[in-house]
Amino acid sequence: MNPSSSPNRSLNPTRGLNLYSTGNEVTWFSSTVDEVNELKPAKSKAFSISAQDQIYGTSSLKSRFSTHEASSEKDDSSDFTLVLPSNRMYIVIPGLMLSIFLSALDQTVITTAIPTIVANLDGGSSYSWIGTAYTLAQTSILPFCGIMSEVVGRKIVLYTSIVLFLFGSAMCGAAQNMLWLVLCRAVQGIGGGGITSLVTIVIADITPLQTRPYYTGCMGVTWGLASVMGPLIGGAISQKASWRWIFFINLPTGGLSLALLIFFLNLVPKPTVSFRVFLRDFDFVGIITITTGVVLFLVGLNIGSTTGHWAHANVLCYLIFGILCIAGFVVNEFYTTRTRIITPSAFKTLSLTSVMVTSFLHYYIVSTITYYIPVYFQNIKGDGPLMSGVHTLSLAVVSSLLSAVSGMGIGKLKNYRYPMIGGWIVLLAGTGSMIAIYYNTDISRTMGFLALTAVGTGNLFQPNLIAVQASVPPALIATSCSAFMLLRNMGASVGISMGAVIYDQQLTTLLKGTKYSAGLSYSQIASIPNVSEKNFVFNAYANAIRMIWIVNCPVAGVGMLLSFFTKQEKLSQSVTEYKEKDKGFKDAP
């Protein structure tokens, strides 16, 4: 098909370039929205994609979804032909896995080393910002990464993110004071957020829907292992060497990942956008409001959970202005005529909205378990950092294995809805079983409850992501994945903060009227001479953590109910291989 062969069609070159594939033919054409609709296959009625949609992944003038969305016809994004580049997957996938491993590892690797770092740098009460700076920067950068990868190209954003991560790691290892360390952790977080976002998008670019679950399963296993191995690695390095090597160790590993991707990653070329067009069409109001809102809201949560003074003016200002900025972002996305950061049309379908919300709830539960089970083992069972990590291995191993099995199962059965529903049912049972974890519960019994919960959490990593990617056409995957990961990270951040609130308030209530207060270590509690008082305090700490698991139950219940509203899309996609001889292509960015 060649658009120029139609004598009656006047194409407007100012509307941008569109990449369109029919069978084995891939052509460039300049087009209006109506012209694109004319040229689409007859079966593909669900989406109206403009020329700018293919460049930015969003539409500056019209909704990305046509009025068909309100009808009862089936949305079938898989009718869009995906043009795949040729890649040596046995090299590219390990390169992507290495980068994901580093990004996930640095979220938790410092947890067991914080006391050593604070003592060495005289950190005092600012210790919490060592972890918060990373997660805050990582979460706030996510909306920007997806849209920029559409503007300047995937490779530029991915490689820049890895370089920023490595630079931040080197500077963290060289830090001489807490301010230096916290600022460089933020640089690390920006790089880590870009890595997380771009790896997900690149996987979607180089794999068809029918085999994609296998590769996302590999990434899920990598993420899960890195998250739980972090405390073990951090504790071992800080005890056996210097805490600075927690950061320096990233350099050779990250350098290898960068080299593999630079030399072996191939992507289908994308249209380039001039700086003038970028300034004219980019949604600066949207990116500023969402970034500011996320930062203010997460800072408010962090300060509130750290100090416990939720009614303080500073905390309320952060939270209120953060919510207002996020609300302003939502309003802006509905009415802006520029390229949207996150299209509201994606949330007009109940199925996709359910997936987005359940992703938030899933990571809320995952974060509460990941962060507060070690508190149980250390403060109540008397474990050290390393042994605490060993006792959480059942959570890590089972969750990672189920993530891989789930991905392979989806790829084999071509169905993500049933694994999603099954995962939520098991997760509800697992969170319910964790309510039975008391002060005197056997370690083996506790690990069994954790393993059951891990079956549920691990089974949900892949279905949610695949459901998002299967529900939108290829042009919208980047921004949809960014929205998915933003909500996922927000769920994790809210889970950590709410867990702290529940724990602190419950512990304060249980110890009220006694001479004991919150913040006691295991050795301090164990040294209480009166046996009945000692058991009372241990039970108070165990019940405070138990309240977190009680709250997780209704959260899991809501997630289970929402999973039934998820629609199963066809996991098959027409694929054509990109060849260097294809005309009209520029170098891949």
Curated annotation (Swiss-Prot):
Name by which UniProt lists this protein: Uncharacterized transporter C3H1.06c
One GO biological process term: transmembrane transport
CDD domains associated with the record: MFS_Azr1_MDR_like (cd17502)
Record membrane topology: Multi-pass membrane protein
Source organism per UniProt: Schizosaccharomyces pombe (strain 972 / ATCC 24843) (Fission yeast)
Transmembrane region(s): 90-110, 128-148, 162-182, 189-209, 217-237, 245-265, 284-304, 311-331, 355-375, 390-410, 419-439, 448-468, 483-503, 545-565
GO molecular function, one term: transmembrane transporter activity
PANTHER family assigned: DRUG TRANSPORTER, PUTATIVE (AFU_ORTHOLOGUE AFUA_3G08530)-RELATED, MAJOR FACILITATOR SUPERFAMILY
Family: Belongs to the major facilitator superfamily. TCR/Tet family.
GO cellular component, one term: plasma membrane
Upper lineage: Eukaryota, Fungi, Dikarya, Ascomycota, Taphrinomycotina
Compartments reported by the entry: Membrane
Coarse class of the protein's main subcellular location: membrane
Family annotation (Pfam families): MFS_1
Entry keywords, A to Z: Membrane, Transmembrane, Transmembrane helix
